Design a protein with these regions (language model features):
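Short hydrophobic/aromatic-enriched beta-strand-loop microsegments
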Residues: 122-127, 209-211
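Active-site metal-binding motif and surrounding structural segment of the metallo-beta-lactamase
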Residues: 60-125
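Cap/insert and terminal regions of metallo-dependent hydrolase folds
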Residues: 53, 66-67, 71-85, 204-283
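Conserved beta-strand hairpin/beta-sheet module of binuclear metal-dependent hydrolase folds
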Residues: 2, 10-87, 198-211
Length: 283
């Protein structure tokens, strides 16, 4: 099993280091860290998709924009075709049809934008996330985070309940239809009720893509949590339940310390984590 670490979308919010902890100018840099997994017998598997081709070319087309203007301005999203998962899959010598499965941490617009670029793929998601994203969206945040046109092209969904077998103290859904047991969904509610991490057995240990369960590298791997002001505020804006989010974040932090040799944890938006993963360096 081979894993490629991709950046499938870049945001450059005003605030610089107040967001990413390292920029020297007025703009920060936040990535959309996705995984492309080459399995032995089940084709290619994507974990999240970032922004898709239609997001790049028609982000605000009425009557239902794929990305709402307030969120695009707030995040200062840089939509680039070369960063879409499809174009990166093609650059690696594969075709869209080679991607047979997509496992999503959740269906926010910056994670699900590329779903329809892989129309032959089965999309695996927590049932609660699917229901919340496709049902009535009452709050302002819900209406902006879940964009109906992004998942419209999905032909095959596989939805899962929250119960499963233990995985390092977390419940985990192990039997993902059509996928090897080396790929698991790990429910991590808080950012959304149906949010989950995706755990992958690499042969050298487990890699847990934690999605938006945390946003900043120093929220893990240290006794005390540290997060930049910008990302701390954004997490609070987007959370559906602060207690669940912070509890799961604390559990992940304990896992990152106590099982450092067995489990590597990376989130969806930290550029330093992405760069280290791409370089094969420890986090």
């Amino acid at each position: 099993m081979k894993i490629h670490h991709l950046n499938c979308g870049t945001d450059c919010p005003l605030g610089g280091a107040l967001f990413d902890g390292r920029s020297v100018g007025p703009l920060g840099r936040i990535v959309c860290h996705c995984l492309l997994i080459e399995t032995d017998a089940d084709g290619l598997v994507l974990v999240d998709t970032g922004y898709g081709l239609a997001d790049v070319h028609h982000p605000h087309r009425p009557p239902s924009p794929r990305i709402t203007l307030p969120w695009r301005l707030m995040l200062n999203i840089r939509l680039r075709e070369t960063e879409t998962a499809l174009r990166q899959v093609e650059a690696l010598g594969f075709k869209a049809a080679d991607v047979r499965h997509i496992v999503v941490t959740h269906l926010d617009f910056d994670h699900a934008g590329g779903l329809e670029d892989f129309s032959d793929a089965t999309v695996h998601v927590m049932a609660r996330e699917y229901d919340d994203a496709t049902g009535p969206r009452a709050s302002v945040v819900a209406r902006n985070r879940w964009r109906p046109r992004q998942p419209d092209g999905v032909q095959q969904w596989q939805r899962y309940g929250a119960r499963g077998e233990p995985w390092f103290g977390f419940d985990a859904v192990r039997d993902l239809t059509g996928l090897p047991p080396d790929i698991l969904l790990v429910p991590l509610p808080g950012h959304t009720w149906g949010h989950a991490g995706v755990a992958v057995q690499t042969g050298e240990g487990w890699l847990l893509h934690a999605g938006d369960a945390y946003f900043y590298r120093e929220e893990m791997r240290g006794a005390r949590r540290r997060c930049t002001p910008g990302l701390r505020a954004y997490q609070r804006l987007m959370e559906v339940d602060a207690r669940s989010r912070l509890l799961n974040q604390a559990r992940l932090r304990e896992l990152s310390i106590g099982r450092a040799g067995q489990v590597t944890i990376a989130c969806a938006h930290d550029p330093v984590e992405l760069e280290r993963c791409q370089a094969g360096q420890p986090l």
